[in-house]
Amino acid sequence: MKSIIKGDSEDRCYICGCTEWIERHHIFNGTANRKKSEKYGLTVNLCHWCHNEPPHGVHYNQDADTRLKQIGQKAAMHEYGWTVDEFREVFGKNYL
């Protein structure tokens, strides 16, 4: 499914705007939540550096990862009309 995250673009990094080495990031990780991220459009495009390189890449930087999860939760709640409890039922945790 196409991303529901406002401002996401297929050809540039959601975080820094770079247009090189773009990779798709599933906002909610883990086997089950990765599939749910795909199903509900909770993905963003990131450059390789913002995605997978320490210390700033979201897979290494807790603050950046949490911020994307908060953005994803707000987007899902808006798009699907979910409450915090309904979001938690799907993804197992509240990030707000």
Regions flagged by a language model, labelled:
Residues 1-12, 35-41:
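Short, charged surface segments at domain edges that flank catalytic/cofactor-binding sites
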Residues 5, 16-19:
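A generic structural signal for short, solvent-exposed coil/turn residues
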Residues 13-16, 47:
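Short cysteine-rich clusters marking metal-coordination/redox-active sites
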Residues 18-23, 52-55:
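Short functional micro-motifs and their immediate structural scaffolds
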Residues 21-35:
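Short recognition patches in nucleic-acid-associated and regulatory proteins
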Residues 27, 49-50:
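Residues immediately flanking
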Residues 30, 45-47:
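Surface-exposed loop/turn and secondary-structure junction residues enriched for glycine/proline
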Residues 34-44, 52-96:
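Polybasic, low-complexity binding patches
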